[in-house]
Amino acid sequence: MKIFRLFIISILIYPQIASAQFFEIGLGIGGSVYYGDLSPDEAADNFKLVRPALGVFASHHFNDRVAFQLGIQNFTLAGDDKINSKENLKYRNLSFRSNVWEIALKGEFYILPFDPERMELPISIYVSSGIAGFFHNPKAFFAGTYHALQPLSTEGQGLSSFPERKPYKLAQIAIPAILGLKYNVSPTISLFIEFGPRFTFTDYLDDVSSTYAVGDELREERGDLAFNLSDRRILPDGEPKKYED
């Protein structure tokens, strides 16, 4: 299982306020960071992997404690052995980036009640969870461009020599677990900031899960590009391995 986290700072606008129920719409901007096999060993180095995240949201509040939210977000995940402090992982020399689209349906519970018209106590704290579907597509940079890794079967997925390794799907499910804070700027506008890990059910966010595929067999079934990108360990002179005819 791999995890990614979203840090969102957003503006919320309330187009309709009723006595007990109301709707809100919002636009979010923030950052995303990945945690997995290609994460750095030093925690502080994770900041080097933060990438932009954007989202739009619509929520229905049943009362000042409970709401449901539908959101769509787009963000990038990235990992790189080059920033790892462990020499054996630098030697491994793997990296990836992935553009991710997520749609999520979540329930929200407000620990501090949320009332956008309550200006004397404008802060609300909430927790949220639900289910998210996302589409990812890990790619690696090689020979001047980015290449999608899933079709290359870099760990032998789908090859005759690895019948137990099935190709992973690019559409996946995640469980968000969110802690957030809202601040009422006015009765119709609020700001919020939230921290939201997503727990996934795939080990291939980064195209890395198990062991290297056997090079010659991979080359025969998937070609030279797959052969090069499956094993990028650095040679003694500091250059990545390259396999050519």
Model features per residue range: what roles?
Residues 23, 65-68, 115, 188-191:
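Repeated loop/turn-to-beta-strand initiation elements of outer-membrane beta-barrel proteins
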Residues 27-31, 56-60, 105-109, 129-133, ...:
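Residues on the lipid-exposed face of transmembrane beta-strands in outer-membrane beta-barrel proteins
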Residues 20-61, 138:
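Short glycine/proline- and aromatic-enriched beta-strand/turn motifs that initiate or cap beta-hairpins
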